[in-house]
UniProtKB/Swiss-Prot annotation:
UniProt keyword terms in alphabetical order: Hydrolase, Magnesium, Manganese, Virulence, Zinc
Entries under Gene3D superfamilies matching the protein: Nucleoside Triphosphate Pyrophosphohydrolase (3.90.79.10)
Species of provenance: Bartonella bacilliformis (strain ATCC 35685 / KC583 / Herrer 020/F12,63)
Protein name: RNA pyrophosphohydrolase
Protein's GO biological process: nucleoside phosphate metabolic process; ribose phosphate metabolic process
Family, similarity comment: Belongs to the Nudix hydrolase family. RppH subfamily.
Length: 170
C-alpha cells in the first residue's frame, strides 16, 4: 500500500549550480533532455545551467568542477566567484514522486561562476567516453539576463538571484 508523503517534511538535496562565462561575457546553458517521463507543463522552458548533487565527503567546489565536466566536458575553466549563500527551490507538486526518488522536497544549491578558457571543441554534452548519462540535448551561449525568462517557473527565483550575483563580474 502506497502512503502519501508530505513533501514539506522532506529535506533539500545539497547541490551545486555552475555558471560558465565565455570570452565574450555570455553564459553557457543546456536544454534538458526531453524524455517520455516528462509530464511537466513547461517542457518548452527546459534551459538551465549545469547543476548536480554533492557527493558525501565532497567539497562544493570539487562537486562543481566534477558536475561541469560530467555534463559538458569542460575542464578548461578558472573560478571567478563562489556565492556565499545557498539558494533553495522546491519541486512543484506535479514532479513529486518523479524526481530524485521522491527523497527530497527540492534542492539547496551553492553557486559558482567560472571563466571558460578552452576551445569550443572541448564542449561535449553526450560524450561516449563519459560514463554518465547525457542530461542535455542542445546547448548555446546567451546573455546572462535572458535566462530567467527561459527556465521552468519553480527555478526562476533562484536564477534571478544568480543573475544578481554574477551580472557584473565579467
Amino acid at each position: 500500500m502506497d502512503t502519501m508523503v508530505d513533501f514539506k517534511t522532506l529535506p533539500y538535496r545539497k547541490g551545486v549550480g555552475i555558471v560558465v562565462f565565455n570570452r565574450e561575457g555570455q553564459v553557457w546553458i543546456g536544454r534538458r533532455l526531453i524524455t517520455s517521463s516528462h509530464t511537466y507543463a513547461e517542457v518548452s522552458k527546459l534551459w538551465q545551467f549545469p547543476q548536480g548533487g554533492i557527493d558525501e565527503g565532497e567539497e562544493p567546489l570539487d562537486a562543481a568542477r566534477r558536475e561541469l565536466y560530467e555534463e559538458t566536458g569542460m575542464r578548461s575553466v578558472n573560478l571567478i566567484k563562489e556565492v556565499q549563500d545557498w539558494f533553495c527551490y522546491d519541486f512543484p507538486q506535479e514532479l513529486i514522486g518523479h524526481v530524485l526518488n521522491n527523497q527530497y522536497r527540492g534542492q539547496m544549491q551553492k553557486w559558482f561562476a567560472f571563466q571558460f578558457i578552452g576551445e569550443t571543441s572541448e564542449i561535449v554534452i553526450n560524450s561516449p567516453e563519459n560514463s554518465n548519462k547525457a542530461e542535455f540535448d542542445q546547448w548555446k551561449w546567451i546573455n546572462l539576463e535572458v535566462l530567467p525568462s527561459i527556465v521552468v517557473s519553480f527555478k526562476r527565483h533562484v536564477y534571478m538571484k544568480v543573475v544578481h550575483e554574477f551580472r557584473n563580474i565579467i
